[in-house]
UniProtKB/Swiss-Prot annotation:
Listed PANTHER family: MITOCHONDRIAL BASIC AMINO ACIDS TRANSPORTER-RELATED, SOLUTE CARRIER FAMILY 25 MEMBER 48
Solcar repeats by residue range: 3-86, 101-200, 209-296
A Gene Ontology cellular-component term: mitochondrial inner membrane
Principal location listed in the UniProt entry: mitochondrion
Subcellular location: Mitochondrion inner membrane
Family of this protein: Belongs to the mitochondrial carrier (TC 2.A.29) family.
Record protein name field: Solute carrier family 25 member 48
Source organism (scientific name): Mus musculus
Keywords: Membrane, Mitochondrion, Mitochondrion inner membrane, Repeat, Transmembrane, Transmembrane helix, Transport
PROSITE patterns reported in the protein's UniProt record: SOLCAR
Pfam families xref list: Mito_carr
Coiled coil: none
């Protein structure tokens, strides 16, 4: 079998759909905690969102991520799987004849995936965050909290058109530098723990990760990845949310400086609990959907040899 396999992209898309549906409500809470104001903690944020917007508030802007993030995950998993397979084959000659995947192969594949993810996912995350944040209170100069009852955007298409009109095409990549600093190490902490944990959990007699191993290893990897990515995720969310009503940040360093001066060091860990908690079910669904779809597409089964 060649090193390039299209099935990885298809399975990544299916896993991406499952991941978005499972994790979107907590993703909304995470974004509002990091970029919004007026919330004491995670549970206070959940109560406030429900009180103001009911259940629909947790799914605000989900149509765009459901369509786009699924494709984004398709590319992420396709790039990672094919890159590490190519590196292993290049290092060992024939893939089937060589030893198991090395840490260096996984590290390089994860880093490349992080770079690719920003190019494709930057606009996706920007639109998602703008739609999630558009009805939030915001702080204007020294006048305290200003509430916004009317949404700034009528939907994903209107949001894109407004950003391009007001900020140009480059506006779609607002926060790309912060996202790059988040995703390159983030995907290393995402894929590498998953690979080794799934291999460790799966019985030796099984061919490929078992469903339980994919679910558990995926969940743990997601919690680790999102937990460690939280500081730069806070910066990214603030830069991307900036521009809905105000333009207060001039870049990554300025955002870090202003956030630290105004709210202290703890601000960079805002939402870490919901990030880690949300990361488990999202990534568990992602990897389980990916592995099961991959086996189905290849006509394989997780069999136990006698």
């Amino acid at each position: 079998m060649g090193s390039f396999q299209l099935e990885d992209f298809v399975a990544g898309w299916i896993g991406g759909v499952a991941s978005v549906i499972v994790g979107y409500p907590l993703d909304t809470v995470k974004t509002r905690l990091q970029a919004g104001v007026g919330y004491a903690n995670t549970f206070n944020c959940i109560r406030m969102v429900y009180k103001r917007e009911r259940v629909f508030g947790f799914f605000k802007g989900m149509s765009f991520p459901l369509a786009s993030i699924a494709i984004y995950n398709s590319v992420v998993f396709g790039v990672f799987s094919n890159t590490q397979r190519f590196l292993s084959k290049y290092r060992c000659g024939e893939l089937e004849a060589g030893p198991g995947r090395s840490l260096s192969d996984l590290l390089l594949a994860s880093m490349l995936t992080g770079v690719v993810s920003v190019g494709l996912g930057g606009p996706v995350e920007l639109i998602k965050i703008r739609l999630q944040m558009q009805t939030q209170p915001f702080r204007e100069a020294s006048h305290g909290l200003k509430s916004r009852a009317v949404a700034a955007y009528q939907g994903p298409v209107h949001c894109i058109a407004t950003i391009v009109q007001m900020e140009g095409l480059t506006g779609l990549y607002r926060g790309a530098s912060a996202m790059l600093l988040r995703d390159i190490p983030g995907y290393c902490f995402y894929f590498i723990p998953y690979v080794f944990l799934s291999e460790w959990i799966t019985p030796e007699a099984c061919t490929g990760p078992s469903p339980y191993a994919a679910w558990l290893a995926g969940g743990i990897a997601g919690a680790i990845s999102w937990g460690t990515a939280t500081p730069m995720d806070v910066v990214k969310s603030r830069i991307q949310a900036d521009g809905v009503y105000l333009n207060k940040y001039r870049g990554v360093v300025d955002c870090i400086s202003q956030s630290y001066q105004q709210e202290g060091f703890k601000v960079f860990f805002r939402g870490i609990t919901v990030n880690a908690v949300r990361g488990f079910p999202m990534s568990a669904a992602m990897f389980l959907g990916y592995e099961l779809s991959l086996k189905a597409l290849r006509g394989e089964h997780t069999v136990r040899s006698e």
